[in-house]
């Protein structure tokens, strides 16, 4: 038959990489002698970004029916495998209807987004702040200059192999310092540098010609998503 839709799902035995914290639920299950894991999760790993989770082929006659069928099949599979729960993380608003129609409960979270309100330049952006905040921002930028740091943004594909090794070491240093596991490997970043092209952007900070800090970002047509960062020391 013809493919009309798909819903990638993960069978998970922990809650790492979701950015939705349900450890309390897992503990409640444990205290009552019930298994919380494995659970079924619809998400982009390590990416708390709202985007389609029910992938529907365009121009089909009944897309709502296809979406509902995907949700229903996931429920059937969860019952068949005796899973504790299904979690659809960060779906788009249009996907709430087929989920709530089957009893899914919405869980509301909070994120902080910066939006460009048509600023002409950086000074125009600064002018939107109070005098005190402008002073603080200018002070932070002055400290960067005084530290002798040079910032550059490059596509992931433009980085050399040695630069990617340095970027990955900086990425790992954040987890070493703050705790947690640096799950994403160097080959993973090198692979998406090729497959994503200009969509993968890396901000590099140089001191005396050497990379000392980095931020790994993903870019859509309208948005820059900061994902991972690391630094060799506290420069400011």
Where is each model-derived feature located?
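Conserved aromatic-histidine-acidic binding/catalytic patches
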Residues: 42, 58, 62, 66, ...
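A conserved beta-strand-loop-helix scaffold within acyl/acetyltransferase catalytic domains
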Residues: 1-36, 72-236
